[in-house]
């Protein structure tokens, strides 16, 4: 399978649980606008591809939340599926999300999310995130 080796099952299970918990914590920090903790969970080179295809850096994204331009009202994930390759992991899940962006209210609706995490200094951080709206 190329240069990627799967992590042993026991370790993978523990890491998968830690990744799920980290992603749920990340969502809570974004909804509550806890930017101190959010910065710790987002890598310096983080990028978000939003449902409209826009690309935001970590500072643009978290700065938008800090300024009130992005206001998550509700964000509840369903089952989070994890695929791990050493110190890199991909998470995929559906969620229900309600948000206000630049004053425009987007009512609660379903989205698919794909997130790429890397382990930095013993801590998992999200590096890439993409959200796709569904109906």
Where are these regions (language model features)?
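A beta-strand edge to alpha-helix "cap/lid" segment located at domain peripheries
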Residues: 1-40, 45-135
């Amino acid at each position: 399978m190329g240069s990627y080796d799967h992590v042993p099952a026991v370790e993978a299970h523990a890491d998968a649980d830690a990744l799920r918990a980290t992603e749920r914590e990340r969502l809570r920090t974004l909804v509550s606008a806890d930017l101190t903790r959010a910065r710790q969970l987002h890598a310096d080179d983080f990028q978000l591809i939003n449902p409209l295809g826009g690309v935001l850096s970590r500072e643009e994204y978290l700065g938008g939340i800090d300024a009130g331009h992005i206001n998550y009202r509700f964000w509840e994930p369903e089952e989070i599926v994890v695929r791990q390759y050493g110190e890199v992991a991909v998470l995929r899940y559906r969620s229900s999300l309600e948000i206000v962006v630049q004053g425009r209210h987007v009512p609660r609706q379903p989205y698919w999310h794909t997130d790429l995490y890397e382990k930095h200094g013993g801590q998992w951080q999200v590096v890439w995130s993409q959200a796709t709206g569904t109906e």
